Amino acid sequence: MRNDNDKKTSLILSACGVIPVVWLALLTAPYVGGGIVEIIRGLTDAMGSPFAITVCEDSVKTVLIFLAAYGMAIGIYFSTRRNYRRREEHGSAKWGNADALNKKYRDKDPSENKLLTQNVRIGLDGKKHRRNLNILVCGGSGAGKTRFFCKPNAMQCNTSFVVLDPKGEIVRDIGGLLESKGYEVRVLDLINMHRSHCYNPFVYLRNDNDVQRLVTNLFKATTPKGSQSQDPFWDTAASMLLLALVFYLKYEAPPDEQNFPMVMELLRAGEVREDDDSYVSPLDELFDRLEMVNPEHIALKYYRDYHSGSAKTLKSIQITLAARLEKFNLESLAGLTATDELDLPSLGEKKVALFALIPDNDTSFNFLVSILYTQLFQQLFYLADHKYGGSLPVHCHFIMDEFANVSLPDDFDKILSVMRSRGVSVSIILQNLAQLKALFEKQWESIVGNCDEFLYLGGNEQSTHKYVSELLGKETIDTNTYGKSSGRSGNYSTNYQISGRELMTPDEVRMLDNRYALLFIRGERPVMDFKYDIMKHPNVKLTADGGQPPYIHGEPTQAVATLVFDSDIPQNAVSVNAVSTSYELLSDEDLEEIFNI
């Protein structure tokens, strides 16, 4: 592009040069007959009045001769021209200016920005600066990913937030600030589940495709990393059984029974006896009744496919599915998923902060966060497309701290590429690029490419050092070489040369001062700037870092019952035996017989 522009400029200047050539030819024409001496003398006099042009019989001939000479000169110039790029022979990389970059990308309203470094912000309105708001943050343990990026951006209080919060540090420090700014704070706490808001994935199943996605994502999220089944039959058959159960609950069960604990109840009701192929389990009876009502029910189709094997095969399939869902046998997880309090679509309509707390030393329950992410993207995209004309009224910012700890959909790179127009953005936070390569072996470069901002906070992983060094590029520098020869006619020489050098070599990237960060914005020079100082944020006084008490979620805020005991017990008080109460569960047939229906 640069060479094309230079060529176009040269042609324009050459064409403009015709005018002075013709002018000079007309001044010279009256003196051509007197020879070179007369031409020199006449031109000297003509310069006294340069626009007093006299047309004579030699004017046309002189103009043609001058134009021919000019054309030959231009032809020689273009034919012998060299493509020089002075001071860029080995590379044109150089450092950008943080203040200039900030002036170009920041929003005038300080609260309507994402904080990248101490002196660089980027506004939320991507239509102004034509960059997406997806940010890739890379920094080793202790580099300040949470303190210098996650918390300052959440403290901006300018979007809805979905924060993956290992250990619960972020919600503890800034939850009070968010509530004081009018946010609804919701917490999916997989560390202390008794303090968590409830999350029921069944609530967000709009159609059959959503059911299929839920089951597929559940199986993917519960598959250990690096494991490959040599026989996928069992997983496929188990997924068919799970689809049958989920479809049955979605279309036939009341809303309060549409949850994973009820899936486990149905699974336990499907007892299979290997020595008795004629045995009909309660689950079989349930689907037999469904067949009488609706023979083409989608749940029945999947159940027939599952039930086409022998009793031994069916037993193995049930065991496979039970192993996938075994976490839902825990009372804590069953209670958490029995109902729903998260109201996921509301994140795109009003300011809500949703925190997903996961243990940093145990990944047993992280599959639930994976399902949450998938359903959040589906709900927000659907809301933007079908209710708000393509873009959410409230921007939603996903802050994915410890990104590598949660399984994400295989097409996450495609989701990343289409979320900008919907008013959704993601901050991917990693310890190093090796984590991203392990998660998305083939798509990791596409994910990096869909993040217009890359923030490097420092680390100690070699491949990341090399990647950052190559991203910085090479610059052209001056070098000196010295020579000295000894002897009777010895001499000393100095040679000056130019050479190429990386802006920062991999070892210099490794030695990056812990106070600094490297910032890359698509189409801009790289910037080295201070990491953001959280203590300089205007809202820090409302957080635990600013001296406020830590935010505690899931605690009762008011008494729901009160017992008052009178200290003066009457002397004539007598004890009364409590009336015993018993319960009996009756089937539909028993009820019909009792009430004579």
Name each region found by the language model.
Residues 115-124, 338, 382, 438:
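Short gly/ser/thr-rich secondary-structure transition/capping motifs
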Residues 131-424, 439, 443, 507-528, ...:
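P-loop NTPase motor domains
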Residues 416-418, 422-518:
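Conserved ATP-driven motor cores of ASCE-family P-loop NTPases powering translocation/secretion/packaging/pilus
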Residues 36-43, 105, 485-489, 505, ...:
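Extended hydrophobic/Leu-rich segments
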Residues 1-143, 147-150, 194, 485, ...:
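Basic- and hydrophobic-enriched, low-structure N-terminal and domain-boundary segments
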Residues 49, 60-113, 208-218, 262-269, ...:
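Short alpha-helical interface patches
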Residues 533:
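Short, surface-exposed polybasic-aromatic patches that bind anionic ligands, especially phosphate groups
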Residues 94-102, 117-127, 147-148, 313-319, ...:
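A broad, low-specificity signal for short, low-complexity segments enriched in glycine/proline
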